[in-house]
Amino acid sequence: MAEAAAASTAASGVIGGWTKHVTCRYFMHGLCKEGDNCRYSHDLTNSKPAAMICKFFQKGNCVFGDRCRFEHCKPAKNEELPAPQMLPLPSASLAGPSDPEPSGPTPVPGAQDWVNAAEFVPGQPYCGRAEQAKVESSVPLIEEFDSYPAPDNKQLRKQLCPYAAVGECRYGINCAYLHGDVCYMCGLQVLHPTDNNQRSEHTKACIEAHEKDMEISFAIQRSKDMMCGVCMEVVFEKANPSERRFGILSNCSHCYCLKCIRKWRSAKQFESKIIKSCPECRITSNFVIPSEYWVEDKDDKQKLIQKYKDGMGSKPCRYFDEGRGTCPFGSNCFYKHAFPDGRLEEAQPQRRQTGSNSRNRNSRRTPLWDIYDERESTDSFDNEDEEMVTFELSEMLLMLLAAGTDDEEVIIRPPSCATSSGRLDPTVTRYRKAC
């Protein structure tokens, strides 16, 4: 048995290794979830217990009470921090002579000071919990945080109090700084009594901010009931906040949300002229302007378009790619065409050249919508090329008749079916191969 115990002790020593000589810090604090299986030592005879003092008990409130695993003891007197030295503000000379301090202990504000707090009256300076009337010396005190000399009282009286400027100063009339006049626009004490320039600048800034807020209010009022013409939902009431944006068409005044109109214009099964037109009135708009609010007035829309173009003009064009690529929109592109050295692309003059059909062709890059419009407006068959097209169609007909089956039906669209607008007549000529 003795040999087995010695073997187990040796095995445990090998398993634990050097950690068995280190006291478990969790066990020292009274909590180790490993128990007997812990790799560290649970022997407190050779270890100094940790002095873990409960900081909540020192503050007077520990919810664990006797069950707290930290030590409940008050700090020694030599460990208490010295009280900060109190110095009067530079406005002490304005407060008059002070009475001698009482010999008894000075009452420290406790948790019941809120009972005697000053009543808050709208439009009046809020004094907070400062008991100015009970201060024996009638002088506000501040803690000495640094050794820099205090500024002159005359200099302080020329500066506006930063606390009164936001609506609250605990020192009231005893403040060393100057309390400005109340601005009738913002209701804050930010107007300097003697500086007319500061008063005029602040009043101007307040009026501009007020006008901007009113414009936003009118825009919200104008936009809150607008319904998208595609999804038939109120834009401001969409479930996803990111979808509460309008897609303003440049040449149309119909209302659409940005998601729906972009989806409409990204369709691939229709021609460009169709997808670029309004779904309701069919007026073509070359671009869509994202907007947080609905804009219908002509002047406001022009301002929005110009703001949109200015914003796009500050972003580099990914097609131009600093001169390495080619942008299909050319000089009409909204994005910035700049080279790596910062130079902007110069607008290239349009060069005209005459083709075989006596039509002017533009050799310069043309915007995509102009390309589509030119393609739609161009006749599919020209008069001078009609004989050549007829000959080619005849050859195609002969090839189909030679390679087709007995029951095969061949549909041919001859040049005579072309209308004056360049589109083919829906009626076609049908040929059936004879047996």
From Swiss-Prot:
The record ties this protein, via InterPro entries, to:
MKRN-like (IPR045072), MKRN1_C (IPR031644), Znf-CCCH_4 (IPR041367), Znf_CCCH (IPR000571), Znf_CCCH_sf (IPR036855), Znf_RING (IPR001841), Znf_RING/FYVE/PHD (IPR013083), Znf_RING_CS (IPR017907)
State the UniProt keywords alphabetically. Metal-binding, Repeat, Transferase, Ubl conjugation pathway, Zinc, Zinc-finger
Please give the residue ranges the record annotates as the region Disordered: 81-109, 345-369
Q: Which GO terms describe its molecular function?
A: ubiquitin protein ligase activity; zinc ion binding
Instruction: Cite the residue ranges of zinc fingers (RING-type).
Output: 228-282
Zinc finger region(s), C3H1-type: 18-45, 48-75, 155-182, 311-340
Q: Where is this region: Makorin-type Cys-His?
A: 183-210
Q: In which pathway does it act?
A: Protein modification; protein ubiquitination
Query: Gene3D superfamilies of this UniProt entry?
Result: 3.30.1370.210, Pneumovirus matrix protein 2 (M2), zinc-binding domain (1.20.120.1350), Zinc/RING finger domain, C3HC4 (zinc finger) (3.30.40.10)
- What is the uppermost EC class here? transferase
Coiled-coil segments on the chain, per record: none
Supply the EC number(s).
2.3.2.27
Pro residues bias spans = 99-108
* Reactions performed catalytically: S-ubiquitinyl-[E2 ubiquitin-conjugating enzyme]-L-cysteine + [acceptor protein]-L-lysine = [E2 ubiquitin-conjugating enzyme]-L-cysteine + N(6)-ubiquitinyl-[acceptor protein]-L-lysine
Free-text tissue specificity from the UniProt record = Weakly expressed in adult brain, heart and kidney.
- Name one matching Pfam family: zf-CCCH_2
Q: Which GO terms describe its biological process?
A: protein polyubiquitination
Q: What does this protein do?
A: E3 ubiquitin ligase catalyzing the covalent attachment of ubiquitin moieties onto substrate proteins.
Record-given protein name: Probable E3 ubiquitin-protein ligase makorin-1
Per the UniProt record, the source organism is Seriola quinqueradiata (Five-ray yellowtail)
